[in-house]
Amino acid sequence: MKYKKIIIGSRGSKLALLYAEKAKKSILKNNPELNKDLLDIKIIKTTGDIYQTQRLSDIGGKGLFSKKIEEQLLNKNIDIAVHALKDLPSIETKNLIVDVYLKRADPREILISKNNINFYELENKSTIGTSSFRREMQIKQLRKDLITKLIRGNVDTRIKKLEGNEYDAIILAFAGIKMLGKKEKISQIFSVKEILPSVGQGIIAIQSRINDKKINNIIKKVNHKETYLCALAEREMLKVLVGDCETAVAGLATVKNKKIFLNCELFSIDGKKKFIFNINGKKNEAKKIGHEAGLNLISQAGNSYKINK
């Protein structure tokens, strides 16, 4: 079979391009008939990359990191889009599909602090940089005395900002730091019991057009089954909640033998209440388990987790 050029769409940050390169290598490894020169990576600047000083919720939400890339995919300017799954809205875009995932990296959160100080040894009223409502509330659960402050930008930008006087520490995803080769910067790795991660954290997602059979047959060979099941459960929970970047929600699924386990946390909008739900079941019922988790969290929280607009 003769193949034309396959264009992979990606954000332009160093980390995003590493994700795209990883996806490209995986596609080539699992499709030996493809010549490496057939796959090209195209950088697409997203709204989230352009506006790096405001909260995502103030300028349009999670789709800011994916909408421009999806437009290119729908217009057939690219054939595949590579995303960090945690950046994708829970509702899929019409005529596009996200159901191929590379093997999940470590989903835990990490702390980078000045002078390499442990989280629990930071001085009273230290300022922690984060761009996530979820992290803000989880930090407050662990230490009410700490101050959280918005920080935006890519990993290098955030580390650079830490060198100034605004922040004493920042919290980031371990997967990104590891991928960038900056593990030596880590002051502490949080357990998932301390800080439950964002839905989809550590997962690279590959998106395509639903009706593009040739491309879908190529990319399905790289799909990691366990990661797929975990993503299915976590994202279904988020979908039921109608969760967006204003929703302080965490979720982590794991597969052990023939069972899937899903741990979830949801915070009220004022951060005063935390709702917890853990569920497990047969791994082939991942979506159903995610749905049940979402419904249970709503039954506990009511509308307390939503901003009245």
Question: Residue spans of the language-model regions?
Answer:
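Small-molecule-sensing regulatory modules
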Residues: 2-52, 58-59, 66, 85, ...
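Mixed-charge, polar/low-complexity N-terminal
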Residues: 3, 46, 54, 60, ...
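N-terminal glycine-rich phosphate/adenylate-binding segment common to multiple enzyme folds
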Residues: 61-100, 106-107
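Alpha-helical segments flanking ligand/cofactor-binding loops in enzyme cores
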Residues: 71, 119-120, 160
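A conserved helix-loop-strand patch within extracytoplasmic ligand-binding domains
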Residues: 85-86, 94-146
